[in-house]
């Protein structure tokens, strides 16, 4: 089992300019800082007999046997990227609820990528994690 803890962030200026469709057209800069609130991602390889290959717990609980059936796009694409083809459970626990503008989706992406690197026994730099999570 791997547990990551990723901080939330507050953007002081430039919020939204970090969105690819915006900065590709207009450019952009963001000034932000992390805060003392976190999103935790727990990744556990399932052992034994399970009914569903993928269990993803976020605001919803998903049970799927095919990656393409996972509704959470971050989880789906991370599992696809890391070629996870064995039973796995992904759970998130957050200090602050989603949709607050504090970067919960980004924190989830970073935490999940970090956890999946660890699960695959690959040491990754912070830069590598950030690039893949983007």
What are the residue ranges of the model-derived segments?
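ATP-binding N-lobe of GHMP and related small-molecule kinases
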Residues: 1-102, 114-124
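Short, conserved phosphate/pyrophosphate- and ester-handling motifs at nucleotide-, phospho-/glycolipid
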Residues: 105
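Alpha/beta catalytic cores of group-transfer enzymes, especially the acyltransferase/condensing modules
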Residues: 126-134
């Amino acid at each position: 089992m791997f547990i990551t803890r990723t901080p939330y962030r507050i953007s002081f200026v430039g919020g939204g300019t970090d969105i690819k469709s915006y900065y590709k057209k207009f450019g952009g800069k963001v000034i932000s800082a992390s805060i003392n609130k976190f999103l935790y991602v727990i990744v556990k390889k399932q052992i034994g007999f399970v009914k569903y290959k993928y269990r993803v717990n976020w605001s919803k609980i998903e049970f799927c046997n095919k990656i393409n059936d996972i509704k959470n796009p971050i989880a789906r694409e991370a599992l696809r990227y890391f070629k996870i083809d064995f039973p796995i459970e992904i759970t998130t626990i957050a200090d602050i609820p989603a949709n607050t503008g504090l970067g919960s989706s980004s924190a989830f992406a970073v935490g999940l990528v970090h956890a999946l690197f660890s699960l695959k026994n690959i040491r990754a730099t912070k830069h590598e994690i950030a690039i893949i999570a983007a």
